[in-house]
Amino acid sequence: MIVIVTGMPGSGKSKIVKEFEKRGFPSVSLGDIVREETLKRGLELTKENVAKVSIRLRQELGQNAVAKLAVEKVRALLKGSQVVVIDGVRSLDEVGTFRGAFPEENIIIVAVHTPPRQRFERLKARGRHDDPQTWEDFEERDWKELRFGIGGVIAMADYMLVNNGSREEYEAEVKKLVDEIISKL
């Protein structure tokens, strides 16, 4: 089984990924693949460079570029695990790449929605190098994600979590969701 986790930046995707990992299931982060590719190209890890590489990869390899780069990692992990989680799928082309590469696998899409203001505050607090510090940067990043096609992936989700309450409430919802998905093994 492949579990694709999607949502806008700062929505709470990593909580879902971490819950699967706590239960012994590995994950592949498409964002990490872009960051690795940025370093391979001799560029410093800045939000500008990561964004440029993300766009350049799609120009060079197609809209599903990052998924193509992840397929072999996912394949290797599936040899040792019943479930592999893929974090950060941003387009239906990427979903299609995984469906095409793994036709025998049950592929489940989990989306997380969090209101924009909450996401902005979380991203500012998170402090990763590519996190926006101004509302304008935040909106620009959101539009970039939407242009990649993330809205289509969210719309096609098998499960949708709304993360607009307390941390404890969301963590309880995540555990419940992971329990439900694992019960289908």
Swiss-Prot record:
Disulfide bonds: none annotated. It holds the Pfam family AAA_17. SUPFAM superfamilies: P-loop containing nucleoside triphosphate hydrolases. GO terms for molecular function: ATP binding. The keyword ATP-binding applies. ATP binds at G7, M8, P9, G10, S11, G12, K13, S14. The keyword Secreted does not apply. InterPro entries: NTP_hydrolase-rel, P-loop_NTPase. Belongs to the UPF0200 family. This is UPF0200 protein TK1334. It comes from Thermococcus kodakarensis (strain ATCC BAA-918 / JCM 12380 / KOD1) (Pyrococcus kodakaraensis (strain KOD1)). The lineage of its organism: Archaea, Methanobacteriati, Methanobacteriota, Thermococci, Thermococcales.
